[in-house]
Amino acid sequence: MLKDLVREKLLTIMNTKAYTQFNPEQLLQLENEMKIYMKSGDSALTEGNYFFLMEMLFYVLVYRNQDVDAQVVYNTFRDRLGENSYKMVIMKATLLQINGNDKGAIEYLENLLNDDLEYETDFVTYVSIAKKLIAIKTTSKNLSQESVLKEVVALTDKFPLDAELWWYASEIYFEMGQFEKACYCLEQVLCITPFNYACFGRLSETLYYEALRSKKQTKTELLEKALKNALRSVELSELYLKGWALVNIISRELGRNKQNDLIKLSASKLNEISAKSNNKDKITAELILNKI
């Protein structure tokens, strides 16, 4: 029974990629928990899920700068699966990257993509490798923001159903202050993932910033649209901190007073979040409440 619970917990963390948001202490705890579980001999763990968890362990070790241990995990994968799967390619590029060889990682991935990989492999393989290449170029400052955007947009033309590409493009447009284009990209994300509450929240936030620099009539229209998206985000996730904060802030920007139902409801929900949620959300909710 205990093994079942641990297995499901670890698989959930992997499926949701929650570990990518963990702090160093949480990563260490996860690493230790995974190593203990993997040695426990769970007969219900399928081979597919075993490699699934080993993949997570690899990236946890990378995040913790345990490059030697990460190499050991990679070698285990390579010995069992070979080097040709896209996950192995991305792992190898990651190892090159953490060992300070960004140039080598970039050349390795570019060579793969240029050797007719676009036409000889499946969609998942090509786009996964292409996204990894862009990520390395971005972190290594190998490309300007405009050049990164150009590559991402080119990929959205080839792979219009990849939500992650549209999200990434929206983030770049947002940083550049091109809010209208950022909104368009987020709307594409929602066409692909219509129940993505975080995307509704981000769209609301982007519309809000666009409204702040617009003329009065357009400003009101944009704020109303931003509020609608914020409300949709909390409809999908009842205790979504960012969503309720946006509901409160946008309602106030629209000139509604403290007795307005939405302002009272959002304040009540922020109080609930500050009492129930994790420490990070509690602190953030309390800061927002102090300002309103």
PLM segments and residue spans:
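N-terminal alpha-helical scaffold/docking segments in eukaryotic complex subunits
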Residues: 1-69, 278, 283, 287
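TPR alpha-solenoid repeat register
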Residues: 53, 86-88, 121-125, 129, ...
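Short coil turns that delineate tetratricopeptide repeat
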Residues: 82-83, 117, 124, 160, ...
